[in-house]
Amino acid sequence: MPSKASVAIVGSGNISTDLLYKLLRSDWLEPRWMVGIDPQSEGLARARKLGLETTHEGVDWLVAQSDKPDLVFEATSAYVHKAAAPKYAAAGIRAIDLTPAAVGPAVVPPANLREHLDAPNVNMITCGGQATIPIVYAVSRAVADLGGVPYAEIVASVASVSAGPGTRANIDEFTKTTSKGVETIGGARRGKAIIILNPADPPMIMRDTIFCAIPEDADRDAIAASIHEVVAQVQTYVPGYRLLNEPQFDEPSINSGGQAVVTTFVEVEGAGDYLPPYAGNLDIMTAAATKVGEEIAKETLAVSGGKR
């Protein structure tokens, strides 16, 4: 039985490089390849120095190798991943997708990871989704017996300098995808997502506000306890994820459409592996992807785990 699952990283940009440092610390995953298309990429150069086999010949090179990875983490673009996904499937390689392609089911570790451990391809949704859907899920499960959460709204504020051209070009896709995740994974009957690119200098870390409508007679202590439990779960893979204060409960009012509301404020500070600490929005994506890969390795790839 191998001690670790073999891993390839497809993409050699900032997110892939940050992901590499997280994977190198894993007891369950062994990064062995980094695949890019630019021979001058800094990410490929760093990976080579760290002992990985690298190529600028793309996914076709990877799937042509006799020794193939157990898992691929892809951080390229939706267009590239949609073209690559069938190649991974044909080669028998499991894929963890950090792009908006959504070829496979979206996964948020505290909420639905166990449901998709056998999926050949899973998607990491969005940074806003990874940061806020766990809270919506926590509230939804606490009020499930009373009809659940009729409406949830999340506002994600990220440092403008941490948002690359892909994010800026796909704001509408971000809001649509995150809103859907608030409903299908978080459990709200209707969801809404807003992203704010904060231009502050020096940059501010990611901050998120999560509004959940709740039944007026809901057990508020149970809701707060559920939120704290889920926050603790996220902190096992994102130590910089934290509540800014206790969940705030408001009575029904005209402003809330006649519904009681619980409001939760969180912030996400990155680990600073490669990306700066203020880029918690990117860090939570690479950390959550690592968590998903580790759980897949533990549960379905027959590896024993262990230190290097």
Curated annotation (Swiss-Prot):
One of its GO terms (molecular function) is NAD binding. Disulfide bonds: none annotated. Its EC number is 1.2.1.10. SUPFAM superfamilies: Glyceraldehyde-3-phosphate dehydrogenase-like, C-terminal domain, NAD(P)-binding Rossmann-fold domains. It holds the Pfam family Semialdhyde_dh. Transmembrane segments: none annotated. Keywords: Aromatic hydrocarbons catabolism, NAD, Oxidoreductase. The active site is at C127 (acyl-thioester intermediate). It comes from the Bacteria. It catalyses: acetaldehyde + NAD(+) + CoA = acetyl-CoA + NADH + H(+). GO terms for biological process: catabolic process. Belongs to the acetaldehyde dehydrogenase family. HAMAP family: Ac_ald_DH_ac. This is Acetaldehyde dehydrogenase 2. It comes from Mycobacterium ulcerans (strain Agy99).
